[in-house]
């Protein structure tokens, strides 16, 4: 069985943790003590997962538990958590699901985006691995077309997406995925609440910034966690010029 096949079967589990990924960038640059430690899912993560599944793998939507409650403080919601066999601390509310379903409907209803996302020959949720900077990295591409990688995003503000892209390390994601799959990345984005949409391409400056982040993250990883680590993680501190 190839490394890629093993990773496809256990992307988020023990096998997946052998690799670095873009989701590790924040921890390595901001809080390396939290590197590779399990974290409880947040509401934006859960909503993002549902949106991606509805857009790309709708046959898996039954995996999501939906609770018809007004808030997460209600008795109905708390009982649903207690009675669930799932190891989770959060479910989607019905009203949240309804909003996400509307986002899916709107994005699918845009002819340009529909043709890009569902073009014949596209592949979905494809895993890639590669040695970058002396370490093995992984990535899972939402959509790969004949020409590019398409990543679907939700945002609270289309106007501020360019700033969110830096904050949430979409620049390093675009650079890493270019290395993994050999194609440029574009982002198709939908704004929560208003359902306004946008298509964002990646400039050379954006990619260079992502490459620089990856380089710094690799330095931290190799210093504190790599096979030839030289320093104790408890000695880490952030050093910046104001």
Outline where the language-model segments fall.
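Mg2+/Mn2+-dependent nuclease catalytic core
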Residues: 119-122, 126-212
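Polybasic (Lys/Arg-rich)
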Residues: 214-242
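Metal-dependent nuclease catalytic cores that hydrolyze phosphodiester bonds in DNA/RNA
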Residues: 1-138, 234-240
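Short cationic/low-complexity microdomains
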Residues: 31, 208-219
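Short helix-capping/linker segments at secondary-structure and domain boundaries
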Residues: 57-63, 182-185, 226
């Amino acid at each position: 069985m190839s490394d890629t096949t093993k990773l496809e079967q256990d992307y988020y589990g023990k096998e997946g943790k052998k690799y670095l990924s873009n989701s590790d960038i924040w921890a390595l640059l901001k809080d390396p003590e939290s590197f590779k430690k399990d974290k409880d899912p947040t509401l934006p993560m859960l909503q993002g997962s549902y949106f991606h599944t509805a857009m790309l793998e709708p046959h898996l939507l039954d995996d999501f538990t939906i609770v018809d409650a007004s808030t997460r403080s209600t008795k109905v919601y708390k009982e649903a958590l207690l009675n669930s066999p799932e190891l989770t601390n959060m479910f989607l509310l019905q009203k949240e699901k309804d909003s996400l379903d509307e986002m899916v409907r709107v994005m699918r209803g845009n002819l340009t985006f529909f043709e890009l996302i569902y073009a014949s020959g596209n592949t979905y949720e494809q895993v890639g691995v590669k040695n970058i900077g002396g370490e093995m990295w992984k990535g899972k591409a939402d959509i790969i077309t004949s020409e590019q990688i398409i990543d679907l995003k939700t945002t609270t503000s289309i106007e501020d997406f360019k700033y969110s892209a830096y904050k949430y390390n979409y620049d390093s994601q675009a650079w890493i995925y270019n290395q993994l799959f050999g194609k440029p990345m574009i982002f198709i984005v939908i704004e929560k609440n208003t359902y306004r949409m946008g298509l964002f391409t990646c400039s050379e400056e954006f990619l260079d910034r992502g490459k620089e982040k990856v380089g710094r993250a690799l330095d931290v990883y190799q210093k504190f966690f790599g096979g030839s680590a030289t320093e104790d993680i408890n000695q880490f501190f952030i050093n910046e010029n104001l």
